[in-house]
Amino acid sequence: TFWSPNVNIFRDPRWGRGHETYGEDPFLTAENGKAYVRGLQGDGEVMKTAACAKHFAVHSGPESIRHEFNAEATQKDMEETYLPAFEALVKEAKVESVMGAYNRVNGEGACASKFLMGKLSEWGFDGYFVSDCWAIRDFHEHHGLTKNAVESAALALTAGCDVNCGCTYVNVLAALDEGLVTKEDIRKACVHLMRTRIRLGMFDDKTEFDDIPYNIVSCVEHKKVSLECAEKSMVLLKNNGILPLDKNKVNTIAVIGPNSNSRIVLEGNYNGTADRYITFLEGIQNRFEGRVIYAEGCHLYKQKVSGLAMPGDRYAEAMAAAENADVENLKIGEIASQLSLQRF
């Protein structure tokens, strides 16, 4: 299973995980999400991989209090904004898995919500439900929905959460002994999981996806499609006639900023490893025939780059680079892997 795509709605730029999503529009999110799921799961005799629609539901920040936050949404907001993408992925793309969110939704824990589970049933969901990691533990530690881990495990399992990412389900047998769950509850969850494994061909002697070599995964054709996707996805918010650069007038470009020559910034989070990385600086150096000046300018989140230096130890370098260039290319921002979950 790949715990992706993230089809939450992104409408506040302060949400540190917004870059994982498809943006603020429910329709566009649904369309992109469906294509992603179909690409992951394939259409062969066995399922290529199991995709996962997350985080169900109303998970769009604030990130710092996600473990105890109660998202209050009207029926109108649920139907028009927060649920359409999930519904489309279930009904049209046949997504194999759905992941519950950390937060509560109108008072109910998302991983044990009668309302949300009812929606999945209404849509004809035929896969398995998984909690976000340690979300079920939040029931008793942060949300106050239960008194202890045994009750939390029982609440989630009986509601329809088949898999617990975390350790709370080690208490399922204790819940069975206390009469909080039944053997049928456990059997039903196991059936859902085994059904997915069968669809993935895990019990077959051999499938068409067992031995795909890296030279196929990273072939020229695939790279061309990735490049086309990147080019068509870019949005130029403001130009004022600067681009494209006039080669006859521009002799020197200053590339400034802590993200200019960073390979980490290209990765995002929950990332794989590419066979090639080209930083912003390297890309400009490769394409521009004139002079390229580089200055780090500052640290991403510290007041200085060098440990023994005074604050702002790279400012003068950046100013000098800018003063000696015809065009300045500034790369600032944050690195996804270091975005603090304790912010908004």
Where are these regions (language model features)?
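Glycoside hydrolase catalytic-domain context in secreted enzymes
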Residues: 1-344
